[in-house]
Amino acid sequence: MKTKSLTFALVASLATVFVASSCSSDDEPEAPVAAQVVGSYTGNEVIMVDNDESSNETKTYEITKTSDTSVDMTVPEWGMGMMTIPSFVVKNIPLVKSGNAITGNVASYSGTVKNAKGDEKAYVVSNVTLMFSDKTVVGTYSLKYGNMPFLMTTTFTGTRK
C-alpha cells in the first residue's frame, strides 16, 4: 500500500512539473509594439491637392523605432511638374496595440527641410494616422509645405519587405 501511495505521489509530482514547464507561446514575452512595425513599406501613394488627384505612384516609406512605443515615419521625396518636395520625417508617433492591430496618431508635427536649391522650407504635417496589420500599413496625413496655398492630403498603403 505504501508503494502505491509513493508511486501515485511521484506520478502526480512529475505531471505537475511537465505541465508547469510546457513550451507554450504564452510563456514568451511579446516584442515591444514599435519593434513589431519597424521596416520599409512599399506601396501605392495617392496625393490629393484641392480635391484633385495630383499623384498616384509606388513609393517606399520607412518606419524606424524611437522607443518601445513610438516610431518615426520617413516620407519619400515626390514631385509634381516643376516642383519637388524633399523627403521629410514625422517624429515620435505614439503607437497603441489592440488585438492584432497597431495604430499611431499625431494631431500635428512641424519641421524644416532643405529643397534642391538649398533653401530651408518649413512643413506642417497634420492628422497623421497609421494603421498596421500583419505586414501592411495604411497611412493618411495632410501636408502644408512652404508657402503653398493648399493642403496636400496623402493616403499610403504599403507592404513591409
Which sequence ranges carry the predicted segments?
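Short, solvent-exposed coil/turn segments at beta-strand boundaries
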Residues: T64-D72, V96-A101, N127-V138
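Bacterial Sec-dependent N-terminal signal peptides
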Residues: K2-L6, T16-N44, G146-K161
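Edge beta-strand at a domain terminus
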Residues: S87-P94, S98-G99, D134-K161
